[in-house]
Amino acid sequence: MGKFTSFLKRAGNATKRALTSDSAKKMYKLAGKTLQRVVESEVGSAAIDGVMQGAIQSIIQGENLGDSIKQAVILNVAGTLESAPDPLSPGEQLLYNKVSEIEKMEKEDRVIETHNAKIEEKFGKDLLAIRKIVKGEVDAEKLEGNEIKYVEKALSGLLEIGKDQSERITKLYRALQTEEDLRTRDETRMINEYREKFDALKEAIEIEQQATHDEAIQEMLDLSAEVIETASEEVPIFGAGAANVIATTRAIQGGLKLKEIVDKLTGIDLSHLKVADIHPHIIEKAMLRDTVTDKDLAMAIKSKVDVIDEMNVETQHVIDAVLPIVKQEYEKHDNKYHVRIPGALKIHSEHTPKIHIYTTPWDSDSVFMCRAIAPHHQQRSFFIGFDLEIEYVHFEDTSVEGHILHGGAITVEGRGFRQAYTEFMNAAWGMPTTPELHKRKLQRSMGTHPIYMGSMDYAISYEQLVSNAMRLVYDSELQMHCLRGPLKFQRRTLMNALLYGVKIA
């Protein structure tokens, strides 16, 4: 358990001349053209916000517009295609989640329809039957009395698909670590196929880094979406195909509705079982100007294997420790679904393995806190708080609350969220640089519980999340990159740095 505090480092202040200069007017005009093209490109709000942020940074800090847009686009689009919304805007989070859900469902349905026969051959008919039940394509009578059987099939299916993905990517990882002369023909073929995808991704990112005018941004965004779709499956399940029907592990799991049927019949939320399509460490390697060696690429791929294995251990934990409790609840109701069962097994939303966001009742724009909770089997969490008014950050490992999904007793180590929040507020209040008005608002906030603003999923391992948080505490160059522009953009950039990490190019 650890506790760390630090002052954030911010770049220089704005100059009034920049706002009225001829160069600023040109930037406004160019930003307008750029935004029009980006809006028409169907890439989404992440790209729009990225261009907006780039233009604002240029005007405020006197930077070259191309450089600013370059940084913002790499962070928001090339890095993830799932840029985080403003942590203190529940409405923005809701809209973002709804749009993401619609896009995800459309892609999943397309994958299942295209690869239906191959999925049945590889994973069996039972998983496709679960999809039909959730979508209401079979009679409800077929489910009645067989609920536990379908829950078991869904969980074992999740584990089977996850292990299959882990085995495929681990083979690639081991092949990359093997000396070139000692590789088998299959290993050489596997590496060559992945190298083609990686090189295409690298070229797309190089175009983004060179984008200094609006046409390049349009072309680059379209290319990124296409390349990321192809590169997201390092070793294909069923072989390569057209970009719009590539069968990714994530799309197959989602399309089969395995998590949905578990949630529907038991109340157990498994939405945290997520793996990034392309791990941020692979994106980081693709941003390097130099040739990426096999050993470096292997270590980046190992990061994705770590996330997949963490999700598989979590699924196994649910099967071993939680499923027996589910069966006990069903036995109370003659082994049939009852409306009380989900309520008995549900846990508080603030205890789920996500990043939970809070703010203070007063001076809310400047102060926000994140509580990151690890997968249930790890029983860990941490607190990180930011006071942007005085440029202060506080990190602390915290204990977790006991609940039914831990499957038994928990070990309480360290202080809880409330104690960490109180210390963060006290420390910020006691800083000599804290303005008097801000002090008064902090003092008022100390006597109340922080306001809960929602949660965000993370698609990296918990250890990688902790590492990203520690970089925000200690890396002054990263802090200067994050603390630019209006507070809204600073908060979004900090969340992106926490969720995915940032490569300063």
UniProtKB/Swiss-Prot annotation:
One of its GO terms (biological process) is symbiont entry into host cell via permeabilization of host membrane. Residues 1-42 are annotated as: Involved in membrane permeabilization. The keyword Nuclease does not apply. It comes from the Viruses. It holds the Pfam family Orbi_VP5. It is found in: Virion. GO terms for cellular component: viral outer capsid. GO terms for molecular function: structural molecule activity. VP5 protein is one of the two proteins (with VP2) which constitute the virus particle outer capsid. Acts as a membrane permeabilization protein that mediates release of viral particles from endosomal compartments into the cytoplasm. Permeabilization activity is probably negatively regulated by VP2 and is triggered by endosomal degradation of VP2 and exposure to low pH. Belongs to the orbivirus VP5 family. This is Outer capsid protein VP5. It comes from African horse sickness virus.
